[in-house]
């Protein structure tokens, strides 16, 4: 099953999600809009198994990183009936 990893602009650049991922799906990239001047990125989503350890590790009130199955992502965008 394919998964979609979304990183939101609430990311504080703490690297907790990157360190929690057992498959190195996430990495930190430079980002001017973030306090820490870096933000999580998910360049290898094809390796994501949906364990959601990144979500559990995120310390922000609104999770900055979310993992969806393809069908969940489609539903959340209002594209499925």
From Swiss-Prot:
Residues 2-31, 39-68 form the 4Fe-4S ferredoxin-type domain. [4Fe-4S] cluster 1 binds at residues 11, 14, 17, 58. Apoprotein for the two 4Fe-4S centers FA and FB of photosystem I (PSI); essential for photochemical activity. FB is the terminal electron acceptor of PSI, donating electrons to ferredoxin. The C-terminus interacts with PsaA/B/D and helps assemble the protein into the PSI complex. Required for binding of PsaD and PsaE to PSI. PSI is a plastocyanin/cytochrome c6-ferredoxin oxidoreductase, converting photonic excitation into a charge separation, which transfers an electron from the donor P700 chlorophyll pair to the spectroscopically characterized acceptors A0, A1, FX, FA and FB in turn. One of its GO terms (molecular function) is electron transfer activity. It catalyses: reduced [plastocyanin] + hnu + oxidized [2Fe-2S]-[ferredoxin] = oxidized [plastocyanin] + reduced [2Fe-2S]-[ferredoxin]. NCBIfam families: PS_I_psaC. The keyword Chloroplast applies. Its EC number is 1.97.1.12. Pfam families: Fer4_7. GO terms for cellular component: chloroplast thylakoid membrane; photosystem I. Its main location: plastid. This is Photosystem I iron-sulfur center. The eukaryotic PSI reaction center is composed of at least 11 subunits. It is a peripheral membrane protein. [4Fe-4S] cluster 2 binds at residues 21, 48, 51, 54. GO terms for biological process: photosynthetic electron transport in photosystem I. Gene3D superfamilies: 3.30.70.20. It comes from Stigeoclonium helveticum (Green alga). It is an enzyme of class 1 (oxidoreductase). Its cofactor is [4Fe-4S] cluster. The keyword Repeat applies. Keywords: 4Fe-4S, Chloroplast, Electron transport, Iron, Iron-sulfur, Membrane, Metal-binding, Oxidoreductase, Photosynthesis, Photosystem I, Plastid, Repeat, Thylakoid, Transport. InterPro entries: 4Fe4S_Fe-S-bd (IPR017896), 4Fe4S_Fe_S_CS (IPR017900), PSI_iron-sulfur_center (IPR050157), PSI_PsaC (IPR017491). It is found in: Plastid, Chloroplast thylakoid membrane.
